[in-house]
Design a protein with these regions (language model features):
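The canonical Cys-X-X-Cys-His
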Residues: 64, 70-79, 196, 200
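Electron-transfer interface patches adjacent to heme c in soluble/periplasmic c-type cytochromes
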Residues: 22-31, 89-193
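Short, solvent-exposed loop/turn and secondary-structure capping segments
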Residues: 35-41, 78-80, 85-90, 144-145, ...
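Bilobed periplasmic-binding protein/Venus flytrap-like ligand-binding cleft at the lobe interface
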Residues: 68, 132-137, 198-203
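Sequence context of c-type cytochrome heme-c attachment sites
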Residues: 40-54, 59-62, 78, 94-107
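Short, well-ordered alpha-helical packing segments
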Residues: 36, 61-65, 118, 130
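Post-cleavage N-terminal segment of exported redox proteins
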Residues: 1-57, 171-176, 197-208
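Electrostatic cytochrome c docking/interface patches
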Residues: 45-69, 81-88, 113, 183-186, ...
Length: 208
């Protein structure tokens, strides 16, 4: 009579019953998959070069982007238009990698409680955005968006901009010394509402 409980060699059961072996194999598979999927992207120009006309954010726009992140806008709004007809008809040209090369980190988001904002730049006036951010129900009665009245009085901190821009330059954003030196003066006197509107108004304007 054969002994069915005797296992030899590299078996499925041995993998499942050994935590260490399972972890090692998972790490190997993930590492290999990452090399195969991610590394080639660094050598494709379409994913590493900016689209024509793309410029780094101005200091005011950059401050607005920081406010967008701070207030968690990415939790309810995406910035990624998929190449589906329903989305391109509603929002415009589908998103491409070259639009986001200066975004660290990118703001693609993962859900749409509110609409996608990838092409919102220039779609509404500054005044519309001002009213909408202070009280969304004044322009969209059925809106679920929270109010942000404090942005109208909170001022952008000029001292934060130069260090932020220098940090971005280290990761490849082509800010010049002159742009960094003039950043504080450019945002001086700007409210957080001004900055956030400036950021929203630039989104998607390089590719329609």
């Amino acid at each position: 009579m054969s002994n069915h409980n005797t296992n030899s060699g590299f078996t499925h059961e041995k993998i499942e019953t050994s935590n260490f072996l399972m972890i090692v194999l998972i790490l190997l598979v993930v590492a290999f998959g990452g090399i195969v999927e991610i590394v080639p992207l660094f050598f494709q120009k379409s994913t590493t070069e900016p689209i024509r006309g793309l410029q780094p954010y101005t200091p005011v726009q950059l401050a607005g982007r920081d406010i967008y992140v701070r207030e968690g806008c990415y939790n309810c709004h995406s910035q990624m238009i998929r190449p589906f007809r329903a989305e391109t008809l509603r929002y415009g040209h589908y998103s491409v990698a070259g639009e986001f090369v200066y975004d660290h980190p990118f703001q693609w988001g993962s859900k749409r409680t509110g609409p996608d904002l990838a092409r919102v730049g220039g779609r509404y006036s500054d005044e519309w955005h001002r009213i909408h951010l202070i009280n969304p129900r004044d322009v969209v009665p059925e809106s679920l968006m929270p109010t942000y009245p404090w942005l109208e009085k909170a001022m952008v901190d000029p001292e934060e901009m130069a260090p932020h821009m220098r940090a971005l330059r280290r990761v490849g954003v082509p800010y010049t010394d002159a742009q960094i030196a003039g950043a504080a003066d450019e945002v001086k006197g700007k409210t957080e509402l001004d900055a956030l509107i400036a950021y929203l108004q630039i989104l998607g304007t390089n590719l329609k």
